[in-house]
């Protein structure tokens, strides 16, 4: 019995260590976001004027996947799908826009883009993009954004990956595409509801303009420093 417990303990340690190494030290996904999108100023847009999804322009599959440079962008970028006009699929709710939390995670701000079956969420320094695109992979393949530690000048934040599927008007996010459900988003009247993996439920209201204090993301994470330069 003792040997079994020891073996189980050793196996658990190696599993945790392997997950940690994968999350923090595996190669970062290549930066595939359009450089003009990343360099542009997302604070200059009226987010109450939503693009018309009439199918007369580009489709989701024609646009490169958006993702986060390093552990966070340095300013709020332009919308990834600003030139996309593909209609939403059957069963999808229209939750596009700029939203801010009024209960739960009060002050949380995010931009939700949709075009066809594709969804992009930009918030707190990160860009999560899932669905058809021109550079590969339906799941988001990105970082969580919170910097756990630094080695010298290099920041280390955990990798994340999730799929998005519509379930009776509710947008479900599953870890790696096959894992557990970790996030939901869905409309409730004029509000957007965000149910997160920590068990919280955040109600958000629509904004037309990005508040000035959200243009540059605040540093996140413990930022434990090793071998500072």
Predicted regions and their residues:
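Amphipathic/hydrophobic helical signal segments and adjacent flexible N-terminal regions
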Residues: 2-107, 207-229
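N-terminal glycine/threonine-rich, aromatic-flanked beta-hairpin/loop signature
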Residues: 59, 105-159
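A mature extracytoplasmic/lumenal domain signature
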Residues: 103-105, 123-125, 175-177, 198, ...
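A structural detector for short beta-strand units
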Residues: 106-110, 127, 160-162, 179-184, ...
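Short, surface-exposed secondary-structure junctions/capping segments
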Residues: 156-165, 198, 217-228
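Acidic, glycine-rich flexible loop segments
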Residues: 157-189
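Short, exposed beta-strand-loop hairpins at the edges of beta-sheets
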Residues: 191-199
């Amino acid at each position: 019995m003792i040997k079994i417990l020891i073996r189980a303990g050793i196996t658990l340690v190696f599993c945790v260590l392997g997950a940690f190494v994968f999350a923090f030290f595996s190669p970062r996904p290549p930066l595939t976001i359009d450089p003009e999108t990343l360099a542009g100023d997302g604070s200059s847009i009226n987010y109450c004027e939503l693009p018309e999804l009439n199918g007369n322009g580009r489709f989701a599959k024609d646009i490169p996947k958006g993702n986060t440079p390093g552990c966070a962008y340095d300013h709020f970028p332009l919308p990834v799908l600003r030139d996309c006009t593909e209609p939403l699929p059957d069963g999808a709710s229209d939750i596009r826009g700029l939203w801010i939390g009024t209960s739960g995670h009060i002050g949380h701000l995010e931009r939700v883009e949709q075009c066809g079956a594709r969804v992009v969420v930009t918030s707190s320094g990160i860009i999560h993009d899932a669905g058809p695109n021109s550079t590969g992979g339906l799941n988001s393949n990105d970082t969580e954004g919170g910097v756990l530690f630094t080695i010298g000048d290099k920041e280390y934040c955990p990798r994340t990956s999730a799929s998005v599927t519509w379930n009776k008007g509710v947008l479900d996010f599953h870890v790696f595409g096959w894992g557990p459900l970790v996030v939901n988003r869905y409309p409730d009247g004029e509000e957007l509801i965000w149910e997160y993996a920590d068990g919280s439920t955040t109600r958000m209201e629509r904004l037309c303009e990005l508040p000035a204090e959200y243009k540059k993301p605040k540093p996140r994470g413990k930022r434990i420093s090793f071998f500072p330069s």
